A protein has these predicted regions:
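PLD/PLD-like phosphodiesterase catalytic module centered on the HKD motif
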Residues: 1-157, 196-338
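Amphipathic alpha-helical interface elements
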Residues: 159-160, 165-170, 174-192, 200-204, ...
Length: 338
């Protein structure tokens, strides 16, 4: 049974130093509450992740020691000590990892997928490198001063206009995507008005590595799965000519398959009534709520368990003989669990 791969986060040592210094040096007040909440959300993300740091162990431990000293030597009050100890105890801390400028296609195609790079300074070269590989580059100032990565809820009104490109405009860049919706290919109109616009909104305009796209749905007839495969790839080649896409379709025929969700390396989207919302005239055929979470950044533990269960369930009931191609290669899946 397939599982979603554990999220790996790469972090510059200078980011860690600045991140914990900012928390220590910010006077606690009513005005600081919003910043505190953002700091805590990212701290919880690091706490639950597999963290890769670009320095050796001795250098990392030296800044941990500085943090403990600030709290009068009491390790129970040092958030950095707690973080590093937890990750070390669980085998989820790696040092001497590549810097952002050193990432390459081989690394991003392996099991050691890094989805986020936390950097101390927002410089064009870092963003450019991240964009080339579909990696979300998050500078420290963005973590603490913007809401771009926070959890959002969008209310969709029946018969009102709906544009997927606008709704997903701020989605962080990615190199892998899973779309799970049993009904999104029910008709040609659903494919044209919903599936393809969603794909266009979430696939970058260019990448140095292949983009991995997995569609888990109910294909109207088994004979149509190859036709659907060819039509989706043909559309992507026209709309995103600078991106090579590895597409796979899993035909989930069971009536038990009902959950609808989209997952990328950093984004989780859930929609109560499904993603086949938009009519030909641009209006929504249902009233519903779309929940958008940047996984790992502002991710409640219960929700993470929920979406993992969605995808595991979908794979357990998929008719693998009707999957096209048959082998699952998406970076988001843990190959050791398949």
């Amino acid at each position: 049974m397939s599982e979603i791969r554990e999220q790996r986060i790469s972090c510059e040592l200078d980011f860690l130093k600045m991140f914990f210094e900012k928390f220590r040096n910010t006077p606690r007040s009513f005005e600081s509450l919003k910043t505190d909440q953002k700091w805590l959300a990212l701290y919880e993300c690091l706490y639950e992740s597999h963290l890769c740091v670009d320095c050796d162990t001795s250098l990392l431990f030296s800044i941990v020691k500085d943090d403990v000293i600030h709290y009068n030597g009491d390790v129970s009050n040092s958030p950095l000590f707690k973080l590093i100890k937890r990750l070390s105890d669980k085998g989820k801390l790696e040092t001497n990892q590549p810097r952002l400028s050193e990432i390459d296609a081989e690394q991003l195609s392996s099991e050691d997928l890094t989805s986020i790079y936390l950097v101390a300074n927002d410089v064009p070269e870092k963003q450019s490198t991240g964009n080339s590989f579909g990696v979300y580059v998050l500078p420290i100032e963005s973590c603490l001063e913007t809401d771009d990565y926070s959890k959002k809820t969008k209310r969709i009104q029946k018969n009102k206009g709906l544009e997927w490109s606008k709704l997903l405009k701020k989605a962080p860049i990615t190199n892998s995507l899973i779309i799970m919706d049993r009904y999104i290919v029910t008709s040609e109109e659903d494919i044209k008005n919903n599936l393809l616009p969603i794909i266009d909104a979430l696939i970058p305009n260019s990448l140095k590595i292949p983009f991995h796209l997995t569609l888990m749905t109910k294909v109207p007839t088994t004979d149509n799965i190859e036709v659907l495969y060819d039509s989706i790839l043909s559309h992507i080649k026209e709309s995103k000519p600078n991106v090579e896409v590895n597409l796979e379709i899993h035909n989930c025929t069971s009536g038990d398959f009902h959950d609808r969700a989209i997952l990328s390396t950093n984004l989780y989207i859930a929609c109560g009534s499904g993603f086949n919302l938009r009519r030909c005239d641009g209006s929504s055929q249902h009233g519903t709520t779309i929940k958008i979470s940047h996984v790992g950044i502002c991710q409640e533990a219960g929700e993470k368990i929920e979406w993992n269960a969605y995808f595991k369930n979908a794979f357990s009931i998929a008719n693998r003989r009707a999957s096209y191609p048959c082998k699952t290669n998406n970076r988001l899946f843990d190959s050791n669990q398949q």
